[in-house]
Amino acid sequence: MFIVVEGIDGCGKSTVASLLAAEIGKKRPVFHTFEPGHVRDGLYRELIMENVDNPFVVAALFTIDRAEHVKKMIKPALAKGEWVVCERYADSTLAYQGYGMGLDKELINRMNEEAIDGLWPDKIFYLDIEPHLALARLQNKEKDALEGQGLEFLQRVREGYEEIARTRGYIYMDATLPPEIIVKRILEEVKLQ
């Protein structure tokens, strides 16, 4: 089972994914991962932050990172029978660089198709939250250049996620709920036995 947790910055992806992986790990092998930067210890993330004002460079770096991530980490984990819980995947690039920054969405889709090599998640859980609430959560957190884009940017990204969700069959989760409740609902959806 390949599970992805998506949502705008400040929605609680990392907290939910960590708790989810811990719960799954009680019953079966699980691999908890994230994008970007899990493959090369943040090399791409550093390059991305240096080029944050160029959506094409950012999208290209994300998809290069994703291609390595899929090939070297996600597919091998799935082949071993592990469940994979991933924070962000292909749709993050579409939402952030396509809807948020205005890069051509078809170009991003083509890049993602190559990067993921046909591997789509079994379930995508979208942690939905109003952008102003997400920004309030990020107040005390050190923000990177993408997280510091502001309210209007996050509104565009959220609108993008909502449009993507209609075609991809996301399972909506109210990100204002306690993380433990969200995880319980996700576990019900994936029917962990």
Swiss-Prot record:
| SUPFAM superfamilies with a match to the protein in the record | P-loop containing nucleoside triphosphate hydrolases (SSF52540)
One Pfam family of this chain: Thymidylate_kin
Q: Where does ATP bind?
A: G7, I8, D9, G10, C11, G12, K13, S14
Mind telling me which Gene3D superfamilies this protein's record contains?
Answer: P-loop containing nucleotide triphosphate hydrolases
Which keywords has UniProt assigned to this entry?
ATP-binding, Kinase, Nucleotide biosynthesis, Nucleotide-binding, Transferase
Query: Per the UniProt record, which EC number(s) apply here?
Result: 2.7.4.9
Give the UniProt entry's GO cellular component terms: cytosol
Q: What GO molecular function annotations does the UniProt record carry, in alphabetical order?
A: ATP binding; dTMP kinase activity
Q: What GO terms in the biological process aspect are recorded for it? A: dTDP biosynthetic process; dTTP biosynthetic process; dUDP biosynthetic process
What family is it from? Belongs to the thymidylate kinase family.
**PANTHER family, alphabetized:** THYMIDYLATE KINASE, UMP-CMP KINASE 2, MITOCHONDRIAL
Q: What is this protein called?
A: Thymidylate kinase
Organism field: Coprothermobacter proteolyticus (strain ATCC 35245 / DSM 5265 / OCM 4 / BT)
